[in-house]
């Protein structure tokens, strides 16, 4: 049954390469269509290939976490808070580096195995070049918040996931990380992700703001606001 679904999904993806009308399919979204074409033409990925994501060896994962230790420290409490706001909804909250490697994951212990089977574990490389269209990897390429819902994924093995991701930038506009909320539940609709996406965006902005303050903690910072009580001093 899974193989039949993967085969149908692969055929749907391949219609993009043929330039056929996809006005009613997942690729009717321009960002999805662009991503599917990148996966086919630039990365030469197979949408029907069902293998687990590449995982960094332990030493390299530790190095990656050390490079972003300050971001991980700042993001930890925000990720826990975000997970609590989504409590009971079957979500995993993930933080990756700028390459798409998962550096932290917050989820309910009872649901950890579900997300591990989906390939969402520490050290997994979810870059678009490796895993095709997905919340993390496509967010990195597009440099904007987005939701990838089920069949909008490139690989058939990922079509059980719904992922809402937001980029995290440093004070100089460089991509630092991606904050992602993923669900493996079938009942999750795309419309329901509007609320989730808003929460992810807010959390990503909070991480950016805290990182900005930490980065310039030895500098004078000027705050301006039309209302004095909103300056935050």
Spell out what each predicted region is.
Residues 130-135:
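Tandem CBS (Bateman) regulatory domains
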Residues 1-127, 138, 144-147, 160-161, ...:
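Intrinsically disordered, low-complexity terminal regulatory regions
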Residues 153-157:
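A short beta-turn/loop motif at secondary-structure boundaries
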């Amino acid at each position: 049954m899974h193989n039949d679904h993967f085969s149908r999904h692969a055929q749907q993806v391949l219609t993009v390469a043929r330039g056929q009308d996809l006005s009613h399919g997942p690729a009717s979204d321009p960002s999805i269509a662009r991503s599917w074409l990148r996966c086919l033409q630039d990365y030469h990925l197979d949408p029907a290939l069902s293998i687990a994501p590449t995982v960094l060896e332990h030493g390299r994962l530790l190095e990656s976490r050390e490079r972003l230790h300050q971001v991980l420290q700042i993001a930890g409490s925000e990720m826990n808070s975000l997970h609590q706001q989504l409590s009971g909804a079957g979500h995993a909250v993930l933080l990756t580096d700028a390459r798409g490697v998962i550096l932290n994951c917050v989820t309910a212990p009872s649901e950890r195995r579900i997300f591990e089977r989906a390939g969402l574990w520490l050290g997994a490389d979810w870059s678009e070049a490796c895993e095709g269209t997905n919340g993390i990897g496509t967010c990195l390429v597009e440099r904007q918040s987005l939701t990838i819902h089920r069949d909008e994924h490139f690989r058939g093995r990922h079509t059980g996931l719904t992922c809402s991701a937001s980029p995290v930038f440093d004070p100089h506009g460089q991509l630092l990380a991606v904050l992602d909320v993923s669900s493996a539940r079938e009942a999750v609709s795309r419309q329901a992700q509007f609320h989730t996406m808003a929460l992810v965006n807010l959390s990503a902005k909070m991480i950016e703001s805290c990182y900005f303050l930490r980065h310039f903690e030895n500098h004078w910072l000027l705050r301006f606001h039309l209302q004095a009580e909103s300056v935050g001093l």
